[in-house]
């Protein structure tokens, strides 16, 4: 294969065709198509995989349809806490931020952590202050708010109270989460991955999922694969899902497709994990597996027509 390629996702979960209007479908497909086409053009122009995934996730953060940046979900306290990670498969350098509320684009803050600090992961106020010191503007958390996300919070609160009072059953996690991500292989053979999220609706303040954790929700290594995950974050952390794909390929000799099948369809469900991931290997092969009802996704090789999807086809 050995071609430049990009894949993106806008989250996985209980995305039922029957609950989606044709107009809603078109909005998601258009947004995914425009963003992946932008990445394809960058790859054609010779941009690095790292720059391509960073820009793709920045655009996803700017789109209110997805749970990252503008349109991020609310915590139980009615606040926003955002997480992001980037990783360069060529150098194995990575940067991440978690629990930030005053940075418009967490993925750009994560990139700054990687390139301008000696650290990999920074959290909360310290991460924000570092980003501000590097020239990022401080923004009001209100910019992330949308009416649809607030309605989700109210519904989750009501369901949570009812479950707590009567059945003790947890909320359906697949309906509360979402993430965005991108993986790419550039024409020089370098891989990169980026992931960003607002977390879970009605999550406890301070909760951090897999998205900003290297090896759990985001991983890239030129020797094997670039991966960005979406789903039940706690299970992705416990299984080191993103790194597990790389390990199965590098040490177990599995193909990209077989490694993804093992992790997404076997290991994650065994622990109650729902969701999916996008991955591209060192040869440019692409995989977009998910075990949930749907996953917003798109991918395309440089110079080709992109492919988009929402449901299990």
From Swiss-Prot:
UniProt keyword list:
Autocatalytic cleavage, Hydrolase, Protease
| Xref: NCBIfam families | PRK10226.1 (NF007589)
A GO biological-process term:
proteolysis
Identify the InterPro entries for this entry: Ntn_hydrolases_N, Peptidase_T2
Active-site residues, record numbering mapped to chain: 179 (nucleophile)
Q: Which gene specifies this protein's sequence?
A: iaaA
Catalytic activity line of the entry: Cleavage of a beta-linked Asp residue from the N-terminus of a polypeptide
**What SUPFAM superfamilies does the annotation carry?**
N-terminal nucleophile aminohydrolases (Ntn hydrolases)
Tell me which family the UniProt entry assigns to this protein: Belongs to the Ntn-hydrolase family.
User: EC number(s) on record?
Assistant: 3.4.19.5
According to the UniProt entry, its GO molecular function terms are: asparaginase activity; beta-aspartyl-peptidase activity
What is known about what this protein does? Degrades proteins damaged by L-isoaspartyl residue formation (also known as beta-Asp residues). Degrades L-isoaspartyl-containing di- and tripeptides. Acts best on iso-Asp-Leu, followed by iso-Asp-Ala, -His and to a lesser extent iso-Asp-Lys, -Phe and iso-Asp-Leu-Ala. Does not act on internal iso-Asp bonds (Als-iso-Asp-Leu-Ala). Does not act on alpha-Asp bonds. Has poor L-asparaginase activity.
Would you tell me the protein name for this molecule? Answer: Isoaspartyl peptidase
User: What kind of modification does the protein receive after translation?
Assistant: Autocleaved. Generates the alpha and beta subunits. The beta subunit is thought to be responsible for the nucleophile hydrolase activity.
Task: Establish whether keyword Hydrolase is in the entry.
Answer: yes
Instruction: Tell me how this protein assembles.
Output: Heterotetramer of two alpha and two beta chains arranged as a dimer of alpha/beta heterodimers.
Instruction: Locate the site labelled Cleavage.
Output: 178-179
